[in-house]
């Protein structure tokens, strides 16, 4: 079984690794299509996608392609690889009709479709406080995340997970699911999506990290969803790090400092309160909340702004 893999970030790297290292020798990854290296950090040094890095660091004999688009001659390159399946996991490009007709294109999407079609399904699961997390394999068509569902898997949330932890758990679950889909593809009964039940999610922007002290639960969920980027911050760009939901019932003044100790600062919201372990001002290193407040001469009863 010849597989062309299309994927870019660490989530996709987990899936690629599972395909390459799978004990079933019938599966062979014959090519990787991924996004181009991008400038990273203050020095803007080029950083390779995680999928590409995995192949290079392990000296795997898998050709790597980083095209600007999936037009000619990329279509001919794909045909030349003679794939039985094209597997797409967080690739970052729309597949044109010319690619979709080369071989069955299977997308692993991090939601229980038709829920959360689009670019940020894992963020949405967290932000919406979902009790059930899941992942789906789908036969791709020309529309965004709208193809027939092949298989799905899910689990009941026991503890709150931040974006990194939930992504890793879903990726590992997705790797197992994808292997099942590939092995059983011809016997799987495809399930058309109910488009009337579809919901959509957008690409995360820097502005999404802006928070205020109105709803403690909402602030806490944002801290989980945006942990890696853009993080959460107040209007003055003060970052709130390591946020814990204390309660979500009592009413307080927005940003009122209720208590300060070694664990952090307890801050009141219009609904509920949160404990913040560390704070980071613009251009500064993160500080323990207690040290930051001492430097600003903020005490219990003051307002964190």
From Swiss-Prot:
Disulfide-bond pairs as recorded: none
Positions bound to (6S)-5,6,7,8-tetrahydrofolate: 111-114
Pfam families for the chain: Formyl_trans_C (PF02911), Formyl_trans_N (PF00551)
E.C. numbers: 2.1.2.9
Domain of life: Bacteria
Keywords: Protein biosynthesis, Transferase
Function of the protein: Attaches a formyl group to the free amino group of methionyl-tRNA(fMet). The formyl group appears to play a dual role in the initiator identity of N-formylmethionyl-tRNA by promoting its recognition by IF2 and preventing the misappropriation of this tRNA by the elongation apparatus.
NCBIfam families: fmt (TIGR00460)
Protein name stated in the entry: Methionyl-tRNA formyltransferase
Organism for this UniProt entry: Helicobacter pylori (strain J99 / ATCC 700824) (Campylobacter pylori J99)
Lineage: Bacteria, Pseudomonadati, Campylobacterota, Epsilonproteobacteria, Campylobacterales
């Amino acid at each position: 079984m010849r597989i062309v893999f299309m994927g870019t970030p660490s989530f996709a790297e987990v899936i690629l690794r599972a395909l390459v290292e799978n004990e079933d020798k019938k599966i062979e990854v014959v090519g990787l299509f991924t996004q181009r290296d991008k400038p990273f950090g203050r020095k803007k040094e080029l950083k390779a996608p995680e999928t590409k890095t995995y192949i290079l660091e392990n000296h795997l004999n898998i050709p790597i392609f980083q095209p600007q688009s999936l037009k000619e001659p990329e279509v001919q390159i794909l045909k030349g690889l003679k794939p039985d399946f094209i597997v797409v996991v967080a690739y970052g490009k729309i597949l044109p009709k010319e690619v979709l007709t080369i071989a069955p294109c299977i997308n692993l999407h991090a939601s229980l479709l038709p829920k959360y079609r689009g670019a940020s399904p894992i963020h949405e699961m967290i932000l919406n406080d979902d009790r059930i997390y899941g992942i789906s394999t789908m036969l791709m068509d020309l529309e965004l995340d709208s193809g027939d569902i092949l298989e799905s898997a899910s689990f009941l949330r026991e503890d709150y997970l931040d974006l990194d932890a939930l992504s890793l758990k879903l990726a590992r679950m997705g790797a197992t699911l994808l292997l099942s889909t590939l092995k059983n593809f011809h016997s799987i009964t495809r399930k058309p999506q109910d488009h009337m039940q579809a919901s959509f999610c957008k690409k995360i922007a820097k502005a999404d990290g802006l928070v205020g002290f109105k709803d403690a639960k909402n602030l806490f969920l944002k801290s989980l969803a945006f942990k890696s980027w853009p993080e959460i911050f107040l209007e003055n760009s003060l970052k709130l790090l390591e946020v814990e939901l204390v309660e979500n019932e009592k009413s307080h003044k927005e940003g009122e400092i209720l208590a300060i100790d070694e664990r952090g600062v307890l801050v009141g919201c219009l609904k509920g309160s949160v404990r913040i372990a560390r704070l980071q001002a613009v251009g500064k290193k993160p500080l323990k909340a207690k040290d930051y407040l001492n430097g600003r001469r903020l005490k219990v009863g003051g307002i964190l702004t």
